[in-house]
């Protein structure tokens, strides 16, 4: 019964408040800038959808999606991430698992991504497991607020 209650807390639409990387050597990084926007949706049928838009993205000069320069296309890709699929909640581990069906980054398709979670009132904190780096380990942290 408790798992149902926790899963129900996920359901709905969430607005991104913060997105940053915390390195084991003390550094903080902002992969989508210091003021990104984003939306995360969990429904009652185990589906999710998430998007993050980097701050400072610039429009293509031509105004045409198919006629951007290589630099414009690269910047647009690097400043945005989107993915969707199904999810499951493991309350005992404090984890939500995303089974990726589609994503802007093709390597994520078919991937399983597990995030640690905690709720603080109407806020949801998601964080990755430590990612091994050459100099330090990284944990990506996203703080969401119910929209």
Task: List the predicted regions and their residue ranges.
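Lipid interaction determinants
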Residues: 1-147
């Amino acid at each position: 019964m408790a798992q149902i209650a926790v899963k129900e807390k996920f359901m709905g639409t969430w607005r991104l408040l913060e997105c940053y990387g915390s390195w084991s050597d003390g550094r903080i990084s902002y992969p989508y800038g210091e003021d990104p926007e984003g939306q995360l949706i969990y429904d009652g049928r185990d589906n999710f959808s998430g998007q993050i838009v980097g701050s400072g993205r610039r429009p293509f000069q031509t105004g045409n999606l198919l006629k951007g320069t290589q630099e414009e296309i690269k910047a647009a890709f690097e400043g945005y991430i989107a993915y969707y699929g199904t999810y499951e909640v493991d309350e005992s581990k404090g984890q939500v698992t995303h089974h990726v069906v589609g994503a802007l980054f093709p390597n994520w398709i078919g991937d399983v991504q597990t995030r640690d979670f905690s709720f603080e009132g109407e806020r949801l904190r998601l964080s990755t497991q430590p990612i091994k780096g050459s100099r330090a380990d990284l944990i990506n942290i996203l703080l969401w607020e119910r929209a």
